[in-house]
A protein has these predicted regions:
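A short, glycine/small-residue-rich beta-strand->loop->alpha-helix junction that serves as a flexible
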Residues: 8-20, 44-45, 120, 230
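Conserved nucleotide-sugar phosphate-binding/catalytic loop shared by glycosyltransferases and other
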Residues: 31-93, 97, 336
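A nucleotide-sugar donor-handling region in carbohydrate enzymes
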Residues: 152-230, 261
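Donor-nucleotide binding loops and adjacent catalytic segments primarily
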Residues: 197-289
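Acidic donor-binding loop of glycosyltransferase active sites
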Residues: 287-298
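A short, well-ordered alpha-helix in the C-terminal region of glycosyltransferases
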Residues: 352, 359-373
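C-terminal alpha-helical cap of glycosyltransferases
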Residues: 373-390
Length: 390
């Protein structure tokens, strides 16, 4: 089959959507042709996709988005999640239809075979885009987590967990659409499945002396591929101030992180910290850690797979609802939003985690229990294809 992805990534919106789709693509590339359709990308991401997928199509926004089209609209529906409306700047119907025509034209140039499946992972696109693409693509799959606009799709995937997970898309998708909801359908890289086979569930610890030596007071810090608010440096600054604690830390930033030089200078002052730039070894770094300070989003499920507790600072609006719910269920510690959390709150949370290993162990075990650890790494893509071809 020919499987196409419509997805974007940038310093501003982050790289999570791109990496999620690339993970899905790698689950099926042995048997299917994969095309990515993207707007302008950071250079290193463009190179990554060119090396990873069969075809990369880059869209020129100037060909389909005029000044008059830069008006946005949020569709009204009875159960639209009002708390996330401001997170999604949905393109007007006219702009979405123009973009669909542009995508079809580009696809026709690149291949004589229309996509059998189009997977759309994009907050600015909704039903008008998908309906227009149906003229050329056999099946439509949408990846979403906002539930704030309608989708004309055959399958909808939302890997996140909410209090109303099973009802939040009512009225927003066709009645016959297959819904793949919750962390059972978490999209994880093959490396996390491989590394997690070496993980055993942490016992509930009775004292600080019971911590396994290789996990003792070792902190992992990571806020994704771009970290536009530079929360990483804020956290490292607080780690620097913890003079009375003995710990080590791995600090991880992605290829789109814009403050590498300043962070390198800061980390170099501390022999108990190691900086990793655009590392492929996140599962191994998670294996080493006692706990992690990081963002929400897909990293919730990576930590859960690796049985690692998270102290979470949300860096995007779409991370808040799931993180709040996981915090309520004692599956993570939510410190707050990146723009609002204070240095004192970060420091106190780190001190709590270092002083309370048994409570951190409970959080890790609770999060791990949300996932199905028996399924194979291609489970999500296999389920999508089976749902469409059944």
């Amino acid at each position: 089959m020919h499987i196409a992805f419509r997805v974007d990534g940038s310093l501003h919106i982050g790289l999570g959507h791109i990496m999620r789709c690339l993970t899905l693509a790698k689950q099926c590339m042995d048997e299917h042709d994969v095309t990515f359709i993207c707007s302008e990308l950071p250079d290193h991401v463009e190179s990554l996709l060119k090396d990873s997928v069969n075809t990369l199509i880059l869209l020129d926004e100037s060909q389909w988005l005029t000044c008059n089209d830069k008006l946005y609209e949020i569709e009204s529906a009875e159960n639209v999640n009002k708390s996330t409306v401001h997170s999604s700047m949905v393109l007007s119907k006219q702009a979405q239809q123009k973009q669909a025509r542009n995508c079809i034209a580009k696809l026709q140039i690149q291949s004589n075979t229309p996509p059998d499946i189009l997977i759309v992972d994009h907050y600015q696109l909704s039903s008008p885009f998908c309906t227009a693409m149906r003229d050329y693509c056999k099946h439509i799959v949408v990846i979403d987590d906002l539930a704030n606009r309608s989708h004309d799709c055959d399958v909808l995937l939302d890997q996140n967990l909410f209090e109303n997970t099973n009802t939040r898309y009512k009225g927003l998708v066709p009645g016959n659409a297959v819904l793949l909801l919750g962390p059972e359908f978490a999209v994880l890289k093959e490396a996390f499945y491989q590394a997690s086979t070496e993980i055993t569930v942490k016992p509930t610890l009775q004292s600080e002396q019971d911590i396994p030596l290789h996990k003792s007071n070792h902190i992992l810090v990571c806020f994704g591929g771009s970290d536009p608010s530079d929360v990483t440096r804020k956290v490292v600054a607080e780690l620097s101030n913890l003079k009375s604690y003995s710990f080590t830390a791995d600090i991880v930033v992605g290829g789109a992180y814009a403050h590498v030089d300043a962070l390198t200078t800061l980390v170099a002052k501390h022999n108990n910290m190691t900086l990793h730039h655009n590392t492929p070894s996140m599962p191994q770094l998670m294996q080493k850690a006692s706990f992690m300070i990081g963002a929400g989003g897909s990293m919730h499920w990576e930590r859960a797979q690796m049985n690692l507790a998270g102290l979470i600072i949300t860096i995007a609006d779409n991370q808040i609802e799931t993180t709040r719910y996981l915090h309520q269920r004692n599956c993570c510690m939510w410190l707050g939003e990146s723009e609002k959390v204070t240095s004192e709150e970060i420091r106190k949370a780190i001190e709590f985690a270092l002083n309370s290993p048994e409570k951190i162990s409970d959080i890790a075990n609770n999060a791990r229990s949300l996932l199905n650890h028996e399924q194979c790494s291609s489970y999500v893509m296999d389920t999508i294809i089976n749902a469409i071809t059944r």
